[in-house]
Amino acid sequence: MTTLLSTIDSPKALRQLNEAKLPQVAQEMRDHIIECVSQSGGHLGASLGVVELTIALHYVFNTPDDRLVWDVGHQSYGHKVLTGRRDQLASIRQRHGLSGFTKRSESPYDPFGTGHSSTSISAAMGMARAAKANGIQRKAVAVIGDGAMGAGMAFEALNHAGHDNHDLDLVVVLNDNEMSISPNVGALSSYLNRMLSGGAYNAFRDGTGKVLKTISRSMWDAAKKAEEHVKGLVMPGTLFEELGFTYFGPINGHDFDALLPTLRNVQKLGGPILLHVITKKGKGFPPAEEHPCTYHGVAPFDKDTGIIQSSSGGTSYTKVFAQELCALAEQNPHIHAITAAMREGTGLNLFEKRFPERFHDVGIAEQHAVTFAAGLATEGILPVVAIYSTFMQRAYDQLIHDVALQDLPVIFALDRAGLVGADGATHAGAYDLSYLRTVPGMTIMAPADENELRHMLHTAVALNKPVALRYPRGTALGLPPEPPHVLEIGRGRTLRKGEHAAILAVGQPVHPALEAAAILEQQGISVSVYDARFVKPLDQRLLQEVAMHGVVLVVEENAVQGGFGSAVLESLSNQGALDRGLKIRCMGIPDRYIPHGTQKELRGEIGLDAVGIATTLKELLG
């Protein structure tokens, strides 16, 4: 049976429909997104929440000539459906399939690549200013969630856009669903909630909303002055208008009768405009509406019942970290935990339940999180900042200037280090070893398995110095638990002794290195395997022992430039080992952006699995 949605291969085709058909398009789009994501997994709730908004934006604005930028991009599945990628949606986040975010190389309707939060207003403002500079008449539209709006970068862009940019054709659509990934926190979220619940405000907006649907451009200036005068009598000036934006809303983001006339009037007006729309995350799929955190990023599920397919059943590294941190916090009342709007993703929801007074969700504000932790540390608190490796990049200056330079005891627990799989290049934890090891005073550890993670967390708590431990996404190895203990700083370990060559690995690749040694053993090649444990400081005695093999392969799951291998080469060079004919190679993430796919697929492609490690070492041996 042919659906209406199947006839739409571009926004131009959408705009040819009578607007009375749009609710049918919305229902069919929801069904299609649910069908595809139930098979592939992906970001379900955010995309379901903006179906009507997505359709309305493409119906009113002349995309791709008008620029449409989706903040983060995980709500863009409907956008992909309308822009020629409908039949590929089932491949989303899979190897050689669609990206889970917007991507410039994927479509001309994706003018800006996204993945990290709160970049859309800055990017759209740049596009709007460039259009003016080039003499082009077009709108730049940024769609940003209320969670992302709480980040510093978004406020920086609002501040700039509203200042002396009255001719700027910029529209910011605030998609207010009271969620980022976890429920929103902070004063902005509270402000929006108060504004929505205010009786006088809503009575006023109900009246002005009716006028807005019919107002002409010629009446606008007078109406604006009148609105400001009357509004001042019934409510304080809104935050956004004080920043220099013309504010409209809030309107129902699921109601075409509200969306279309409002967007048409917004399209006619100049200057920076903020349109506030109210949506429900997971709209149209009851399990996602009732459990928005669970269905934010979801594994394949039964589309009829909503039951999510179970994973392998093992314990994740994230959960191992969270459970051990809770155990340590039972003994140490000075331990506090900090997250930047990722309490479930980092496992700190477990900590929050047990120690709510020592748990801090700062919102999407990584820079603030790090300096907030530094302030806590000055007063005898031991803060643990649990953060994805890719988001640690956003607070590098704070890590150096506010933590390391002052030698403050802050623990950075870097989750999703290395290859992350389906989220792709924007979320790869590929750089932390490279940028952290340059910082004086930092101790850096990378566990090979869950027992090592427990040991290293105990070591970090005991150290009383700036320290980072990085661990991968996914299920731990399922090893029998060992009693956790404090490790000697800067000491690695010997896992296997051989005669012909040595593999020196750190972090996740340690166990694949052991498997590679077993493969080579079957071919008559005897290989030693070492676990460095510490990237900084390095175990100099261990390096001397490794170099004595004459043939060395260094393996890490980090960018090969500037990472662990580079540190080993620098140290061996200083020891003079490279002057004595040592054959050494470094394996890691190559100097390119690794696309999305499963971790197993990606490790196989770049040679960071057991077979790839064995093959590389055999080639090195000649």
Swiss-Prot record:
Q: Write out the catalysed reaction.
A: D-glyceraldehyde 3-phosphate + pyruvate + H(+) = 1-deoxy-D-xylulose 5-phosphate + CO2
Q: What EC number(s) does its UniProt record assign?
A: 2.2.1.7
- Give the originating organism: Magnetococcus marinus (strain ATCC BAA-1437 / JCM 17883 / MC-1)
Instruction: Cite a single Pfam family from the UniProt record.
Output: Transket_pyr
Q: Which residues bind Mg(2+)?
A: 146, 177
UniProt similarity note: Belongs to the transketolase family. DXPS subfamily.
Which pathway does the record list?
Metabolic intermediate biosynthesis; 1-deoxy-D-xylulose 5-phosphate biosynthesis; 1-deoxy-D-xylulose 5-phosphate from D-glyceraldehyde 3-phosphate and pyruvate: step 1/1
Q: Name one GO molecular function term.
A: 1-deoxy-D-xylulose-5-phosphate synthase activity
How would you classify this enzyme at the top EC level?
Answer: transferase
Which cofactors does the annotated protein need, by name?
Mg(2+); thiamine diphosphate
Encoded by which gene?
A: dxs
**Where would one find the signal peptide in this protein?**
none
Free-text cofactor note: Binds 1 Mg(2+) ion per subunit.
Q: Which residues bind thiamine diphosphate?
A: 74, 115-117, 147-148, 177, 285, 366
Q: What is this protein called?
A: 1-deoxy-D-xylulose-5-phosphate synthase
**UniProt function note:** Catalyzes the acyloin condensation reaction between C atoms 2 and 3 of pyruvate and glyceraldehyde 3-phosphate to yield 1-deoxy-D-xylulose-5-phosphate (DXP).
